[in-house]
Each structure stands twice: as C-alpha cells, then as structure tokens.
C-alpha cells in the first residue's frame, strides 16, 4: 500500500490483486519444495549407505544396523571435517540447523539468500546426517526451500515483504514434503517465520504447502509417517498431561541452555571454527558406538518409540545419548536439523514416564511428550500439536496434545529469555520480539489525535510579511500550512521555502504554482485515516507535520497532525496493558 494513497473505504485487510501474482509464483515454489525434499532425503540415504555400508545406494537403511565396530567412531568425525571445509570455503551460512538463519534473512537480510546456500546446505546436511550426525532433514529443508523461494522471488520485481512471503513459502513447502504435514507447516510459518498474520503472506504459504502436499505422493510415500491410534482418555489424563508438559518444558529449557553453553565452549577453543564439527563428531561417534540407534535421522526409532517397541531402559539410554550427542554436535556449528532429534528425545521421555502416568494408554505419552519438547524448544505450541497429529493422524490424541504443548510452552516462556531459534540471532546483536498484536496506530484515527487549533498563514500575505510574522524571533513551528480565503489548503511552507533572491513584495500565493500543487496534493491526512497511514506518509516523505483536510476535493483545513501526536495511541495501549482496575464490586 503506497504511503501517499488515500483510502476512503475502510477494509479488514489491505491485500490487493498482487496477492494473486504472488500466489501463482508460490505454486511453482511449492513444486520445487517437493523436488528439494526428494533430493535431500536421497542425499541422506546415499551418504548413509556410503559411510556405513560402503555401497552406492538410495535404499532406506538405518546406521544402527552397521557392523563397523570401533570404526564407527571415525565416521561422524570425517563427516564433520568435510562439512567444516565446505562451510569455510563455500558458505558459512550452511552452519547450524537452518531456522535461525532463515529468520535472520527474513528480518535483517531483506529475504535475500544465495544460490550457494540452496546447493551447499542439502549437500552438507546429507554428509553430516549420512555420516551419523544425530539430526533430521527438516532444518536443512527449511533453509534449502527458503533459499529456492528467495531465488525465484529475486527473478521478479518484488518488495522485501513479498520476497519474505515466497522465502517462507519455499521453506514450509519443503517441510510439508518431508513430513506430510501441510497444516503444521503453515502454523510454523505463522508462529515462527512470517512475523505477521496477513493475507498477503498467509495465502501464498498455504498455496505452496498445499501444492507440496499434493505432489508429495508422486515422489515420496503417501500417508502419515508414523500412523498411530491411541485409546480414549480419562479425566485423570488431565493431570498427567500437565505433568508431561512441565517435564517436557523443563527438558526443552535444559537442552536449550546446554546447547549454547557447549557453543560457548567451542568458541573458546584456540582452533578455527572449521575444525569444530570434526571435534563434535568425536562425541557423536563415541555415543553412536554405545547406542547405535542415536545415529542419523532416526525415523525408524521414532516409530519404535511410538509403538512401544522399546523397553523403558532402552528408551532411557537412547534419550540420554541422543540428547548429549545432539547438543554437542549442534553446538559445534555443524549442519543439521532439530525436529527429528527432538521427536526422539521427547518420545524417549514419554516412554520413560508412561508407567507412572494414568489416564491414557502407553502409546499416548511418547506422542504427547515429543510434542511438548518440540513446543518448548520452538516456542510454537500450535505447530507442535498439529505437527504431532499430522505425523500420526491420531484424533484421540488431539486434546492431550493441545494441553501438553500449551503447558510446555508456558513453562519455557516463563523460564527462558530466548529460544534455540532466537538466541543465536540475539548473540549477533539483533533483538527479536515474538509477541504480535494490533498496532496501536491502527486502532485510532487522525481526528482523534490531531490538533484542532491550527496556526495557518493566509495566502494573501506578502513573503516579507510572512517571514516577519511567522519566521522571526517569535517562530513557534518549523513549518506552517498556507490557506486561501476559504481556508482551503495550498500547501506547507518553512523558512527554506523562501529563496534569498525572492521578491518580498510578492504574495505568498505565488509560491504555489500548479506544478507544486499537483506534486503536494497527496501530502495531507484525512480525518478518517488511521494514525498508521499518517505515520507511514510522514516517514516516507520525511515530514514532521501533516495538514488534515476534510476531503481531497475541497482541501479545507481542519487540523494538523505531528510526530508528537502519534505518541498518543501508545498511551492508550499502555493504559490497557498496565492499568489494573476492578470493575465489579
């Protein structure tokens, strides 16, 4: 919406027909997201077979079935070494799990990502995960899909906001293709990536995720990844869900804190960061030697945990080893994702807790605990709940999922200043505020905050009289509106408007020739416009004050709005947020 445009008809949304064009581009991006997911998953399978079974194959095989013995310790080290070299001499953007990097590009990089990232991120992630790295494909596909969306957007004349929409469309389309969870992917965009809730961004993301969801069965398996059907729940499950949520949130906070402590320890090493992933690989290799199921993506392990195929002791061992090697590996700055490891860790917690939690069958608690851990780490409870449902299609679990993720989210919100998603960005000097609300400037109109008493200069005064009366020692304002005898606005003048060579005997009206009037016609505010529109117009044209007129035809001056007036809506907002009062007695 142009800052100079005047809108006479109020609407719920500011979307226009450009939304259709962006949505059409999102269709292409959705298809590309599916292709990118297919390529990434096959890269992971290829490198898994190459590292652990010394074969060139795209077959789905788990690292846990290897027979390498102690040699398995060297594989994550080798993978980390290769990725360190790729990051050093290719692109440093491939380091990390992808989501913070995508957020940084969205908020502070005008949503511009390079082709290098689109190529090197899936390659590096395939190598790391294929060599035993305890990561999932979702972080890399979010970064890769986002890079593809950004690159396609850069082919067109788009605003940074439109590029952001297409970047997020690519990221969420990739996530949809990997997991088959389009609704959860849209919610991830809303809760974590878009930083707004508007049709201009929501609709293209929905389109891209829908296209990815429809095209997914053409290249990947159809249906839920982990089909599950739990039994009905009793009232006692209410208290069990609260406890599971608290413990899931506590585990989330513990892992988040541990991750950045490990990252700080790596930062103190007298070695270039290029070597850190190889050092982290040592811990991964040792952990994988004692607990092979902790290596790699581990989708098969998630299925075993959800279906109760692991005993409590095995689940506890897996939980501890997976958490430790994940924290160390990710803290070393290697390339990987967070969702799949969190699912394993959370499901392991649920398996351990299941014998002591009444109200639901044993399969319910691994599911709700994995969603709780995910909600706590991401700070996205709706995404976590719907994601867990999308993975299993278990309708009986929806209510427990909602409560457990909400409790875990509340726990981490109250106990953690930052999440894994934002801490890295904050350490680079950026502040991210994740609470959204209606802009106070959007809720009040110009006529509610403007000054109704206006000092205006009659156009019939001479230039000399104007300078003497309004721009002499008694000057009050930097600029003044100039009006004709019917109080119709001609324009605004300030001292710099008068040329030193100007004839002081000329009437002030001579300054306002037809060309000037046409150029400045839009530089007014209407009383029915919101303060946000007025603020945008003032910021765009570097103005301190805007004259307020009844309408654009008569241009009759009725007030003036200044920058200081735009503070008034914030006072009302402050009263609503801070002023406590009892209304019923």
Show the residue positions of the predicted features.
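Alpha-helical transmembrane segments and immediately membrane-proximal extracytoplasmic
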Residues: 1-443, 447, 451-464, 477-480, ...
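Cytosolic Rossmann-like ligand/nucleotide-binding regulatory domains
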Residues: 476-477, 545
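Tandem CBS (Bateman) regulatory domains
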Residues: 422-455, 462-471, 489-544, 551, ...
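Short, acidic, Ser/Thr-enriched surface-loop or helix-capping motifs
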Residues: 483-485, 549-552
């Amino acid at each position: 919406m142009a800052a100079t445009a005047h809108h006479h008809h109020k609407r719920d949304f500011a979307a226009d027909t450009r939304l259709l064009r962006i949505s059409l581009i999102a269709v292409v991006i959705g298809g590309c997201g599916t292709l990118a997911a297919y390529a990434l998953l096959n890269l992971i399978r290829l490198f898994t077979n190459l590292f652990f079974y010394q074969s060139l194959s795209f077959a789905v095989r788990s690292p846990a079935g290897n027979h390498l013995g102690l040699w398995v310790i060297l594989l994550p080290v080798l993978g980390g070494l290769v990725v360190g070299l790729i990051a050093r001499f290719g692109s440093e953007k491939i380091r990390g799990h992808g989501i913070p990097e995508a957020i940084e590009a969205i908020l502070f990089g005008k949503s511009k990502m390079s082709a290098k990232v689109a190529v090197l991120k899936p390659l590096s992630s395939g190598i790391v995960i294929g060599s035993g790295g305890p990561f999932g494909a979702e972080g890399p596909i979010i970064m890769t899909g986002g890079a593809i969306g950004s690159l396609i957007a850069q082919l067109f004349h788009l605003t940074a906001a439109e590029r952001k929409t297409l970047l997020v469309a690519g990221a969420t389309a990739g996530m949809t293709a990997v997991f088959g969870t389009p609704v959860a992917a849209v919610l991830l965009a809303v809760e974590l990536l878009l930083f707004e809730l508007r049709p201009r961004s929501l609709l293209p993301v929905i389109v891209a995720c829908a296209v990815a969801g429809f095209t997914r069965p053409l290249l990947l398996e159809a249906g839920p990844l982990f089909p599950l059907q739990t039994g009905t729940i009793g009232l006692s499950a209410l208290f069990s869900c609260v406890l599971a949520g608290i413990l899931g949130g506590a585990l989330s906070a513990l892992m988040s804190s541990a991750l950045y402590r490990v990252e700080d320890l790596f930062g103190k090493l007298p070695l270039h960061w290029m070597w850190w992933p190889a050092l982290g690989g040592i811990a991964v290799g040792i952990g994988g030697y004692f607990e092979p199921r902790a290596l790699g993506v581990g989708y098969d392990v998630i299925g075993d945990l959800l279906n109760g195929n692991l005993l409590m002791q095995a689940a506890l061992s897996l939980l501890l080893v997976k958490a430790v090697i994940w924290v160390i590996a990710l803290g070393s700055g290697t390339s990987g994702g967070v969702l799949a490891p969190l699912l394993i860790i959370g499901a392991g917690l649920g398996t351990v807790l299941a014998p002591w939690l009444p109200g639901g069958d044993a399969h319910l608690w691994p599911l709700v605990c994995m969603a709780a851990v995910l909600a706590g780490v991401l700070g996205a409870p709706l995404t976590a709940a719907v994601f867990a449902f999308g993975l299993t299609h278990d309708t009986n679990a929806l209510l427990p999922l909602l409560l457990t993720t909400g409790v875990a989210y509340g726990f981490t919100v109250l106990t953690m200043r930052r999440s894994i998603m934002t801490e890295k960005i904050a350490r680079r000097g950026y502040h991210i505020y994740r609470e959204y609300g209606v802009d106070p400037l959007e809720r009040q109109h110009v006529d509610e905050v403007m000054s109704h008493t206006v000092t205006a200069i009659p156009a019939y005064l001479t230039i000399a009289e104007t300078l003497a009366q309004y721009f002499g020692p008694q000057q009050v304002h930097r600029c003044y509106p100039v009006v004709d005898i019917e109080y119709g606005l001609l324009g605004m003048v300030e001292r710099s408007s008068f040329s030193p060579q100007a004839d002081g005997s000329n009437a002030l009206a001579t300054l306002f020739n037809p060309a000037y009037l046409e150029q400045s016609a839009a530089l007014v505010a209407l009383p029915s416009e919101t303060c946000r529109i007025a603020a945008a117009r003032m910021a765009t044209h570097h103005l301190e004050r805007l004259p307020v007129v009844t309408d654009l035809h008569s241009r009759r001056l009725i007030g003036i709005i200044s920058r200081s007036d735009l503070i008034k809506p914030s006072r009302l907002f402050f009263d609503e947020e801070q002023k406590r009062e009892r209304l019923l007695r």
